[in-house]
C-alpha cells in the first residue's frame, strides 16, 4: 500500500474520532438543563385498603425551569410519614419508548402519579391505621429523578415535604 493510501486511511480514522468527540460534546450541553428539574410531593391519597396492605396514589409535580424539553423515565423514592419510613417506591416509564413518555416542555410542569403499596407488617399496626384513616398529613419523599432528552440523561437527587 502506498504512502498516499496510508495517509488517507489515517485521515479517515482521525476524522471519525473527531466526529464522535463532537457528538459527545454536543450531547453534554443538555446536562445543565436536565439537572435543573424540580420535584414537589404534591399529594398522597388512599386508593384502597385491605387488612394487611393499602395502596396509595403518590403524586409528584415535576417542574422544568429550563428551556429544554425532556422526559422523566424514573423517579425512585423513599416515603416517610411523621419521620417514619413507610417504604420505597418507583415511578417508571422505562419500558415506554421516548416519544411515548410525558414530555415536560420548558417552563412547564407535569403531575406524575405512582401507586405506593404500604404493608402493615413493615410499618406496624399503629402507623398503618393512622395512614388508612388519613390522620397523617406530614409526608416527606426523598430520592432520585432521572431526566432524559434526545441526546442526554441526568440523575438528580431530591427531597420534598408535604
Give the role of each language-model region.
Residues 1-55, 150-162:
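Membrane engagement elements in two modes
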Residues 48, 60-66:
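Asparagine-centered strand-capping/turn motif at beta-strand->loop junctions
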Residues 68-76, 87-90:
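Short, hydrophobic/aromatic beta-strand segments
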Residues 76-80, 142:
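Beta-strand signatures of extracellular beta-sandwich domains
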Residues 83-123:
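Intrinsically disordered, low-complexity Pro/Gly/Ser/Thr-rich segments with frequent PxxP/GP/PP motifs
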